Design a protein with these regions (language model features):
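UBC/E2-like fold recognition across ubiquitin and ubiquitin-like conjugation systems
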Residues: 1-171
C-alpha cells in the first residue's frame, strides 16, 4: 500500500509541476511529457545559455522520475549530442542535486548539495543550465571532456561547436 501512496503523491506532484510550467514558462527551456499517458517521463529541451560555448544550441533530454518522487531524484539523460565534463558519454547528467540524498560515499559532496524533495523540474533544469555555463572538472563524469576543458580548450570548443550545430540541424 505504501508504494501505491508514494506513486499517487508523485503523480499529483508531477501533474502540478507540469501545469505550473505550462502556465508560467521559464526562459531557457521547455518541458512536456514524452507520452501523455506517462507522467513519469518528460521531454526537455534546453536552450544553450547565452554567452557560453553552448549558446544557440537546442539540446534535448529525457527526465525520468522514480515512483517515489520527490523522495528520490529523477535521472536526466541528454538525447542530443553533448560534450561536457559533467555529462557521461551515454548522455546522463551528473550534478550533485541528482544524487540520492545522504552522505557521499566518495566524499566529494556535502549531504546538503545532494537531492532533497524541495527540488522541482524547474530547479533541476536551471541547475543543468548553470552546469552548462560553469563545468565542474574536479569530479567529472566524462574524464576526456574534463581533460580537454583543462588542457586543450580549443579542441573542447570545436566539439561543443559541432554539438551546437547538430542540435540546430535537428530542429
Amino acid at each position: 500500500m505504501a508504494a501505491s501512496a508514494a506513486t499517487t503523491q508523485a503523480t499529483l506532484l508531477l501533474h502540478k509541476q507540469l501545469r505550473d510550467l505550462m502556465k508560467n514558462p521559464v526562459d531557457g527551456f521547455s518541458a512536456g511529457l514524452v507520452d501523455d499517458c506517462n507522467i513519469f517521463e518528460w521531454s526537455v529541451t534546453i536552450i544553450g545559455p547565452p554567452d557560453t560555448l553552448y549558446d544557440g544550441g537546442y539540446f534535448n533530454a529525457i527526465m525520468s522520475f522514480p515512483q517515489n518522487y520527490p523522495n528520490s531524484p529523477p535521472t536526466v539523460r541528454f538525447t542530443s549530442e553533448m560534450w561536457h565534463p559533467n555529462v557521461y558519454p551515454d548522455g546522463r547528467v551528473c550534478i550533485s542535486i541528482l544524487h540520492a540524498p545522504g552522505d557521499d560515499p566518495n566524499g566529494y559532496e556535502l549531504a546538503s548539495e545532494r537531492w532533497t524533495p524541495v527540488h522541482t523540474v524547474e530547479s533541476i533544469v536551471l541547475s543543468i543550465i548553470s552546469m552548462l555555463s560553469s563545468p565542474n572538472d574536479e569530479s567529472p563524469a566524462n574524464v576526456e571532456a574534463a581533460k580537454e576543458w583543462r588542457e586543450k580548450r580549443d579542441e573542447f570548443k570545436k566539439k561543443v561547436s559541432r554539438a551546437v550545430r547538430r542540435s540546430q540541424e535537428m530542429l
